[in-house]
Amino acid sequence: MLLATFKLCAGSSYRHVRNMKGLRHQAVLALGQELNRRALGGPTSGSWINQVRRRSSLLGSQLEDTFYSDQDLAYIQQGEEAMQRALDILSNQEGWKKESRQENGDEVLSKVIPDVGKVFRLEVVVDQPMERLYEELVERMEAMGEWNPSVKKIKILQKIGKDTVITHELAAEAAGNLVGPRDFVSVRCTKRRGSVCVLAGMATDFGEMPEQKGVIRAEHGPTCMVLHPLAGSPSKTKLTWLLSIDLKGWLPKTIINQVLSQTQVDFANHLRKRLESRPALEARC
C-alpha cells in the first residue's frame, strides 16, 4: 500500500512542481525529503527487491543543493521510472522459463511482459565483493569496451546529479554479423539501498546524439542490474540482470532470442575475467 501511494504521490507532485516557476526546485527537494522519511519509516522486508522498491522514490535521492532544468528533471524522472518498472518485473516470480543453465550455475530465464515484450533474466554469483562489481559497471563504465566484446564503446554524454547519466553505447555485430551495428542512447540511474545496489536504465532522446549513418538506433526497455552480497558469503556477489531490448530492423525472433540470451552468458564470463585481472579502485556505491 505504501509503495502504491508512494508512486502516485511522486508522479502527480512531480508534474505539478514542474509548472511552479521559482518554487520548483524547493518543492522537489521537500518532496524528496518527505518521501524518504515516509519510506524509511515503513516495516522491514526480508526481500531485497522490496527493500529497494520501498526505499527508492522519485527524486528522493536528488537532495544536493543544485538547480535542475526541466529537461534534467525529466531525465531524472525517466531513470526513476525505469528502475521501478524493472524492479516490478523482477519481483514477480511467476511465468519465468529457463533458457539456459551453465555448469558454473549461471542461469538465464525469460518471460513475455505485456507492453514490453520478451525480457531475459541472468542470475549469477561472482566470487568478488559487491564494491568490485560496482567499480567496473559504474565507475569504469566507459571502459567496458575493453573487456566486453559485445560493446565497442560507451560514452557518458551528460551527468545529472549524483545518480543519473545519459549514455551512448555502440554495440558490436552479433550472430556472425547477422545482427549488424546497433547503438543505444539511454538514461541510467544508480541507487544504493542498504546492502543492495541497483543500476537501471531505458532508452531516451538526447538532441546532441542523433542517429548515426550506417547504424540502427536500437532501444533498451526497462532494464536493470541488481547487486547484493551473497547470503552467508559477503565476499561474493549475487548479480541479477534484467535485459529488455528492441533491436529494431527486420530480424527473426529466433535469432534475437538466441543473441540476447547468449549475450548475458558471455557478459558474466567476461566480467569475471575482468575482475580477476584488474586492481580495485577505492569506490563505494
UniProtKB/Swiss-Prot annotation:
It holds the Pfam family START. GO terms for biological process: cholesterol metabolic process; intracellular cholesterol transport; regulation of steroid biosynthetic process; steroid biosynthetic process. The keyword Calcium does not apply. Pathway: Steroid metabolism; cholesterol metabolism. Residues 67-280 form the START domain. InterPro entries: StAR (IPR029866), StAR-like (IPR000799), START-like_dom_sf (IPR023393), START_lipid-bd_dom (IPR002913). SMART domains: START (SM00234). Keywords: Lipid transport, Lipid-binding, Mitochondrion, Phosphoprotein, Steroidogenesis, Transit peptide, Transport. This is Steroidogenic acute regulatory protein, mitochondrial. It comes from Sus scrofa (Pig).
